């Protein structure tokens, strides 16, 4: 995948497969995550009670685990969902929000890391912390650049056999051997809550598609970068940007 | 009510009564639901702790029970709220999200169905499942058309004495004897999360109004169809559609 | 601070300090609250499990406690967070949503009132109830004007040593001795869910800034009033208003 190049083949694939994506995500980004998935043609569903989460993870095409507003009951339900997904052979993706900075979620993420995630998507601080190379940033913000965390991402991919996406001004997606670089987007994406979390949901969905998973995850990053580049031209601030971003995802082919 | 005809009398009634609507709804659609109710002149409130839910349901004009992100504590609080509403003679409305597909919520909804809901609003798969006529779809999506579920809706209305709205490309609202048909809207409404759930909140609010409840619920469906028809002309994708939809609800009279 | 005058010095201060604001707020307004803080240059984070809430409150610059969708586990986590903030010398702000109308949250807020909040932001009914001068309104709506609650606000400020902001068509901010008045804004702000709750988050963040706290809280109210005045001119209803409001916060200096 070349920088700044939208992967129209992967996009077409994504839209026609319409992956049913089970999102166990944080309370702040649920609506935006669902609307991002809908704009790309996927089918989002949020199911959180432990019994149902396990049942639904087996029915869905993909599972997202995002620990942004983790609680003890949610952690238990997430474990059940991961078990349901694994038993059914469905891929699950981890978004380790603020791991490193906060102890409870750090322990939880380290525990579930052994349950073979298909992909991991985080910012530099989170990937560094998850790889055991840093004590992390001050919460959800990253204090490192994505490139500085690329060695950690590669090490984490080799350790877990997951595709690891470390994202920021530039995104890097690696399987531990090959690394793809995705540029584009705009800094305005950091002034709207949930763009990173929603990207993780798109990554989760993309892991359910056939074909090369590294390519699929890189393509997912590319969808969001491209939409960000388009939306910033249509907006006067982060409010209109958020709407324009969803519109841009909807119209990606036409704008390519 | 004629197809494609906005019931301005019901709308005026809705706006001047400004029903205080207690929404116990899912985590994904809370903001959108509140903003839909506000745009129509109603007063939304979300109260979820069991003790408070029971107390508030008695104070509010109407109660919505939406099981989209049901949990065990929430189920208990919902029971208490229904008891509070019933003791105070206030109507409650059920949105049986994904019933049929998931076991825990299916059991819960079957149990509370005996507590005399004033109205039930669901898609075809959900109404079929609730009426015991289908095993349901794959989660929140429906795999049936609303018309195919009309016999189930009529049977469910006769069984429960609730007004049943089975909604989709065309909406059908029935009391088991009479059925009203509401057309209009746009497929874009399915690409924004929460339009169905928000409709259920408007249905709940409309059940608190005096007059014929079948007419009031059909009018509620008509408000949303009309706003969808207007909004799609003002939008370039589901992001701008969501904003335009709220604006259209706000401006319904002027556009009629 | 003069009425209708944007405090550009305070705004610059706010943006350059970028306070990390720990929001324990209700389920309905999380996204909007985060986006308001981001548009003003602050850094929001929602952390809710008790252990993490205590840990994070000590790391953050400011803590917001909003009881809109209070539950028993959340109440326990909020106590822990307040303890964490106090032990680290960080200010916390209370938004007593619907206090007076609902018993459980009223008891909770009266208990935590002794834990020395830096600021309290509510509507007239809530401030009257918290000061023990009223039985409260019908939930989240206020049935009193802010000016009618000014004596209660002054009494509450003297009792708690907090800055008290009682907001509505006109906002009053008092430390019990001095009172500042903030005008502007638009009634459309009451038709978008979360403007009051988001203001409380901005108040919380502003309490972390050096300088006179009364001025800082009044400036926070002024940011929101000014954005509301600008946004209403750019919008056709509450949907476009919500986007325009976020844009206006982002562009406050340019529009001043």
Curated annotation (Swiss-Prot), chains A, B, C:
Pfam families in the cross-refs: HK
Protein residues bound to ATP: 121, 167
Pathway: Cofactor biosynthesis; thiamine diphosphate biosynthesis; 4-methyl-5-(2-phosphoethyl)-thiazole from 5-(2-hydroxyethyl)-4-methylthiazole: step 1/1
Cofactor(s) named in the record: Mg(2+)
Gene3D superfamilies: 3.40.1190.20
Keyword entries, A-Z: ATP-binding, Kinase, Magnesium, Metal-binding, Nucleotide-binding, Thiamine biosynthesis, Transferase
KW Repeat (keyword) present: no
Residues reported to bind substrate: 46, 194
Highest taxon of source: Bacteria
EC numbers on record: 2.7.1.50
Reaction(s) the record says it catalyses: 5-(2-hydroxyethyl)-4-methylthiazole + ATP = 4-methyl-5-(2-phosphooxyethyl)-thiazole + ADP + H(+)
Keyword Nuclease listed: no
GO terms under biological process: thiamine biosynthetic process; thiamine diphosphate biosynthetic process
Enzyme class: transferase
InterPro entries membership: Hyethyz_kinase, Ribokinase-like
GO molecular-function terms, A-Z: ATP binding; hydroxyethylthiazole kinase activity; magnesium ion binding
Physiological role: Catalyzes the phosphorylation of the hydroxyl group of 4-methyl-5-beta-hydroxyethylthiazole (THZ).
Family membership noted in the UniProt record: Belongs to the Thz kinase family.
UniProt-recorded name of the protein: Hydroxyethylthiazole kinase
Organism: Enterobacter sp. (strain 638)
